[in-house]
Amino acid sequence: LGIVQILVWGGSFFLIAILGGPIIGDTGWSARWVYGALSVGILTSGLLAPLCGRLVSRYGGRFLLSWSGIVVALGLSIMASAGNLGTFMLAWFIIGVGMAMGLYDTLFAALGNLYGQDARHAISRITLISGFCTTLVWPALSFLVEHFGWRHASLIYAAILVVGVFPVYVRVLSTKTGVQEVAKEKATTGSPLGGGLYALMTAAFTGAAVIMTAMSAHLIALLQGQGY
């Protein structure tokens, strides 16, 4: 599951850091719009997150997680054929739908739904493994872009997502659905956060996310600008 997360994160959240420059050079589109497309994906993902959470709670996460790679792959395929900014933004909207379906929030909710408190260990291991995403995906994407161009690189990565995500989730999650009710009974019930604490945590997480997103999108370009 950690490796699958690397694939999905690499094909969505961390993608534009490598493809942004080649896209701008090939199309002549403004850097503001090209890099800003990631915001479209993140906004779409955030708006759909509550719905995905409710679906996981009611039906489990197998369907959403299994199809997330295919949805992101569809977005990448549309992006690869984009001849204008409208199509490019549509591609990132679709990628955002896949992000909502397949990134940490949905996966961790699904694991919690299956295993209750026992999911903590699996979540920790998955987070540790997927933390190597940029270490693995950025060099791989750079290689693909250098040898095939950004459009074909997007299509190749889309194919990897289709092959690598759907079968894993179907196999892993299909055999675990029978323990959902047990996990729910074992889960402890806590009090909801107060308004002030909730607002403070929201502000902290939002600030951290803004910094992380900005750095992940522009880090490669910044380093290249310094001659690295």
What are these language model-derived features?
Residues 111-120, 228:
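Paired intracellular helix-loop junctions of major facilitator superfamily
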Residues 12-21, 194-228:
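Extracytoplasmic gate region of multi-pass secondary transporters
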Residues 23, 101-115:
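Intracellular juxtamembrane helix-capping segments at the cytosolic ends
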Residues 2-31, 48-52, 138, 215-220:
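Extracytoplasmic
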